[in-house]
Amino acid sequence: MLQNSTLALTDHEVLSISTVLDAVRKLDNAGVDQCDPLIITQASSLSQLPVESSSLDIVISICRSLEFPCDKLLAEISRVLKPGGTVLIQKTSQSVAGIKDGETSLERKLLMAGFLEAQAIQLKPVVPSEGAQSFGIKAKKPSWKIGSSFSIKKAEKSLPKFQIEDDMDLIDEDSLLTEEDLKKPQLPVDGDCEVGSTRKACKNCTCGRAEEEEKVEKLGLTMDQLNNPQSACGSCGLGDAFRCGTCPYKGLPPFKLGDKVSLSGNFLVADI
């Protein structure tokens, strides 16, 4: 097997070394003076390159056919190039429109073959002829190997740490209370009036019974009528709409006969 740092492929029958070196110079290669390229002519019939894998720095393809190099040959070029190696494909067109279409098609073809950084460059035609113009596309083989893998370390998230000082001043809740707050509340007396079958308000009544009796007196009702309401007509408990003009229960809310009638504290207080 032949080995060399630079390989030139062409579908021409003859290709001069100077043409290959001019193409190498377009790649800004500093070692072009020491370059001794390997040239393969009529390479369109090749299905495999006679070069070891990952042994070349540069592969140059100078062709006149639009189908050269084919997809299979591009895969071979990728095989023989070192990781990060450069490939240059030079073609000829008779029109400016053909150059634009050829560059676009060739860039897409190289990207589909796995090459990176496809870029168009201007080149001299291999065979000078009237109206013929050359164009070239250079690209690079990825610097990593196909099928290589590496592990990605997941960044560990640390929870924020809060420092609590043990000697922090704590407020005693009892110190917030005043002397008035500490006094025991006095519960109201249930009833200090006389206890019996007929309870009446005492002289110094403080439980509110005197006020209730005063309201009853204004209505003209007796305590017996309130405690045991009776009705001769049977309509007194239905409400004012059914009561007669002299009904003693007029003004009271509806109630059931036989139930004790209770007055609210604001029964006789004016609304306005």
Curated annotation (Swiss-Prot):
It is found in: Cytoplasm; Mitochondrion intermembrane space. Keywords: 2Fe-2S, 4Fe-4S, Cytoplasm, Iron, Iron-sulfur, Metal-binding, Mitochondrion. One of its GO terms (biological process) is iron-sulfur cluster assembly. Residues 1-153 are annotated as: N-terminal SAM-like domain. The keyword Mitochondrion applies. Residues 153-182 are annotated as: Linker. [2Fe-2S] cluster binds at C193, C202, C205, C207. Its cofactor is [2Fe-2S] cluster; [4Fe-4S] cluster. SUPFAM superfamilies: S-adenosyl-L-methionine-dependent methyltransferases. A motif (Cx2C motif 2) lies at residues 244-247. It comes from the Eukaryota. InterPro entries: Anamorsin, Anamorsin_N_metazoan, CIAPIN1, SAM-dependent_MTases_sf. The keyword Metal-binding applies. [4Fe-4S] cluster binds at C233, C236, C244, C247. Residues 193-207 are annotated as: Fe-S binding site A. One of its GO terms (molecular function) is electron transfer activity. A motif (Cx2C motif 1) lies at residues 233-236. One of its GO terms (cellular component) is cytoplasm. Residues 233-247 are annotated as: Fe-S binding site B. Monomer. The C-terminal domain binds 2 Fe-S clusters but is otherwise mostly in an intrinsically disordered conformation. The N-terminal domain has structural similarity with S-adenosyl-L-methionine-dependent methyltransferases, but does not bind S-adenosyl-L-methionine. It is required for correct assembly of the 2 Fe-S clusters. PANTHER family: ANAMORSIN (PTHR13273:SF14). Component of the cytosolic iron-sulfur (Fe-S) protein assembly (CIA) machinery. Required for the maturation of extramitochondrial Fe-S proteins. Part of an electron transfer chain functioning in an early step of cytosolic Fe-S biogenesis, facilitating the de novo assembly of a [4Fe-4S] cluster on the cytosolic Fe-S scaffold complex. Electrons are transferred from NADPH via a FAD- and FMN-containing diflavin oxidoreductase. Belongs to the anamorsin family. This is Anamorsin homolog. It comes from Vitis vinifera (Grape).
